[in-house]
């Protein structure tokens, strides 16, 4: 294998949990060129993956003339981690010899010649482990344990200049990231505000992060305190990654910044429901200091798979205790 393409064109958290399989490929094929195809906004995250040689923006690829697309897609193998119908047909047209995709997509029957049969929805495996099923056709047949997954991570944050108004001391800086763009069940905003105030009054610097749109949903609720800072809408992803890596801890639900914090090696605290398939068994962050909280490990509503708001019952005091 001289050139391997890995396609994961969804969100930051999903891309973050693709890192271990990239590292496994690097170990299996140390001389291969490994290229990641994704949404352009995830580029800064992928740049931190030491196993990846290059990043291609899928929209930029599709905007090229078809002849240029086919020329660019010259490779020995493509792995469709997140199925994309247009890319799957394009990869076949480009005559990539090994085209790997799950058997659970009808269009893969016509576009992929290697179709591992596995299901994500009802699996007990972590998302990062599930991705390894796609490596079986390449000779990586063992699914690593979650502990082994932790050891596979090689994440290197590039130094990035941060705005001058960002506090420089990081030993007492806690990041709170309340929103998730609707991708996860969220802890109540009022509890984030209570947590922020208690942390600030104990001498911590509290920074709220999120997009500008997310900031408009809670900015007016922020307690007035010298140690509580609103950064929403003010940081690029490059800056956010660097900012997180230089902080002491981060609290969020199951969303991208939680996974960035875990990979960065800081104390990452994720707030979860136990309902599958959005439970921490599937989506907890990878990292030496990554942890998670649920209200009730045995929640019956979650076990039944019904809509449950038990995450809202996680106490502020419990989160404070875990922050330490």
What are these regions (language model features)?
Residues 1-324:
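Catalytic machinery of carbohydrate-active enzymes
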């Amino acid at each position: 294998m001289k050139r391997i393409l890995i396609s994961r064109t969804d969100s930051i958290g999903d891309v973050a949990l693709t890192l271990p399989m990239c590292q496994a490929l690097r170990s299996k094929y140390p001389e291969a060129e490994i290229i990641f195809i994704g949404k352009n906004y995830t580029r800064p995250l992928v740049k931190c993956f030491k196993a990846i040689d290059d990043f291609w923006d899928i929209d930029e690829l599709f905007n090229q003339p078809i002849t240029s697309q086919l020329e660019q897609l010259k490779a020995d193998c493509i792995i469709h981690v997140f199925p994309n119908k247009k890319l799957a047909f394009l990869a076949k047209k480009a005559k990539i010899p090994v085209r790997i995709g799950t058997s659970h997509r009808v269009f893969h029957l016509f576009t992929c010649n290697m179709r591992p049969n596995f299901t994500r929805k009802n699996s007990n495996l972590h998302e990062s482990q599930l991705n390894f099923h796609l490596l079986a056709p390449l000779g990586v047949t063992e699914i690593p344990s979650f502990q082994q997954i932790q050891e596979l991570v090689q994440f290197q944050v590039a130094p990035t200049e941060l705005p001058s108004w960002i506090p420089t001391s990081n030993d007492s800086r806690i990041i709170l990231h309340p929103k998730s763009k609707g991708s996860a069940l969220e802890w109540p905003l009022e509890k984030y505000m209570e947590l922020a105030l208690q942390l600030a009054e104990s001498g911590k610097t509290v920074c709220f992060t999120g997009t500008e749109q997310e900031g408009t949903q809670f900015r007016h609720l922020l307690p007035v305190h010298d140690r509580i800072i609103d950064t929403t809408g003010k940081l690029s992803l490059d800056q956010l990654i660097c900012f997180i890596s230089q902080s002491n801890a981060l609290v969020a639900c199951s969303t991208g910044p939680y996974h960035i914090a875990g990979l960065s090696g800081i104390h990452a605290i994720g707030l979860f429901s136990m309902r599958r398939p959005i439970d921490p068994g599937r989506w907890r962050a990878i990292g030496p200091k990554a942890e998670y909280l649920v209200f009730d490990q045995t929640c019956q509503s979650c076990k039944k798979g019904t809509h449950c708001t038990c995450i809202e019952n996680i106490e502020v005091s419990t989160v404070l205790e875990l922050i330490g």
